[in-house]
A protein has these predicted regions:
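N-terminal accessory beta-strand-rich subdomains and adjacent acidic, glycine-rich linkers
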Residues: 21-233
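Bacterial Sec-dependent N-terminal signal peptides
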Residues: 1-21
């Protein structure tokens, strides 16, 4: 049996009231994630000292209200680091996959949590709820702010019944019309020629995320949430 090397470092910090900036670096310290908690929760991703993009107003709209709530109060921040080898059940390209990241888990006073992981190759986040009974999610919100001259490559489509065979379009963000949508994966190239790829994982009993064009910026788009809202209204 092959051994698995796991290095975990954990630090728990208690916060009274509202945190302004919570920073997490990638293991190689090249990427920096800065989470801001104020009227809403936002995050900024830096490569070195250059701001790559920002994600504004991260929240779920549920039948229990917004998660996290507006002007959310931070209860605690838990930091950990992982360095291990993952052996996949089904070996495709690799029989062993190195996994190395720094994680920050923010717990709010409404008992909701946001989990952020920063790898050398990218960043991820997800919601963790602690609500009683079934939870109806009306929508998941995130506004992705890039330089308007960034080039977006994705399959533009307008139906939840998409066959995912639409041709890929290549346009500046500023050239995409408001209301247009497209599925993942989606690739963005910044003016400094950094490629940012949008992906999602571990989606179960939940609609897949698309990207849509808002008034100015890209935003998360979920077909099922909008159909439920229309039926209720």
């Amino acid at each position: 049996m092959k051994g698995v090397l796991v290095t975990v470092f954990s630090l728990l910090i208690s916060y009274m009231g509202m945190a302004k900036d919570i920073e997490t670096l990638s293991p190689d310290k090249n990427l920096k994630l800065n989470v801001s908690v104020d009227d809403d929760v936002s995050m900024q991703v830096y490569m070195g000292t250059d701001l790559l993009f920002e994600v504004k107003d991260i929240h779920l709209d549920t039948d229990h209200g917004l998660v996290p709530t507006r002007r959310a109060k931070v209860r605690s921040v838990n930091r950990s680091s992982v360095d291990r080898i993952v052996v996949p059940e089904i070996k495709e390209k690799f029989s062993e996959i190195p996994e190395k990241y720094n994680e920050t888990l923010i717990t709010f006073k409404d008992k909701s949590k946001l989990q952020f992981r920063v790898y050398n190759e990218g960043v991820v986040y997800r919601f963790i709820t602690d609500l009683e009974g079934d939870v109806v999610i009306n929508d998941e919100h995130a506004e992705f702010v890039f330089d308007q001259s960034s080039i977006l490559t994705f399959q533009q489509d307008s139906s939840m019944n998409s066959d995912y065979e639409a041709p890929y379009i290549v346009k500046n963000i500023s050239e995409i019309e408001q209301g247009k949508t497209g599925n993942l994966p989606a690739l963005l190239q910044t003016p400094s020629s950094v490629n940012v790829l949008f992906l999602e994982s571990a989606t179960e009993d939940y609609p897949c995320m698309w990207l849509g064009k808002g008034e100015e910026n890209l935003q998360a788009h979920f077909w099922l949430a909008r159909i439920v809202q229309q039926a209720v209204n």
